[in-house]
Amino acid sequence: LWVLLLWMSYLVLLLPLAILFVGSLKNWFLRLVGVGLLGTQYGPDSLLKISKNLPWLHSITSQGVIAAFALLILACFLGKEWGFHSNPNLKFIKSSNFQYSILIILLLFTFIDVFYNAFISYDKQIWTAFFRYSIDLQKKYVTIASFTSALEPGILEETERYLAIIILLAGFKRNRSWRVPIAIYGSALLFGLSHLGNSGWNGETFEATIAQVIGVMGSGFLWAILYLYSGKLWIPMIFHFLMDYLANLQSGWNSAGWQFNGWATDYISEVLMVLVPLAVTVWMMYGKRRKVLEENADRLMNLPVEFNRY
């Protein structure tokens, strides 16, 4: 019971201060800085002493899952305070511009991206960067920690993406031609840069960290465009969790997150990870696809939207 009470307290710990200080900010850059500072405040939850005799409760707390949910709750209140839609998940409204086939294509490319990132196993031979895969899921890594360490970034980092998207949409609302591209590519850039802190994590080299910063931007492009097209934050959360969980099941949750050997295939793989998702997002910027992105952007901003429904 006391653990649940502790969790309930932690979930709303920073809410008053966040609303008071960050909620009052009007400048988009200062809002990004404020959100970034709030994100760093949720690290101490790993120091909360929950007995290892309660393995699920211990892992959920120490791996930062509670912190992730706390930021998600905070994001809803901040969005409302800034005058935006308070729920990151928009109610589905099928306009004449929305196409199920486009959503299926986006889901397919996102799944391919997860599969490539999780299972590509190249060596120095050029062809292996395209066609060599290894699925090595190990039973010894099917642990609570592997699950919770993937769940935490799936929730927390996608919440941070949502906040970056709405902040950038609002910051560039006067230029409707550029607000959606800026929100998508800007949030992906911030997502990539957030991995700079991984340098040294369980032996990850600085070169590998730079490669990770660049490589994950590709996934960031897809997850951002998928969110704006579907209006559902839980969809990219699932894909983000799946990518990390598959990695954990192959090498353990506390292994180095990225490898870089300086081979030509390292660079080819990086290019594939970024350019393919980038091409998908560019394709989404035109026609009815773009109109759906704009409609959902307006809805997130609480701006009036005229839907032509079937």
Question: What are the functions of these language-model segments?
Answer:
Residues 28, 96, 100, 178-181, ...:
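Membrane-water interface of alpha-helical transmembrane segments
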Residues 143-310:
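Transmembrane helix-loop-helix hairpins at the membrane interface
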Residues 1-92, 245-310:
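N-terminal, membrane-interfacial amphipathic/helix-forming hydrophobic leader that caps
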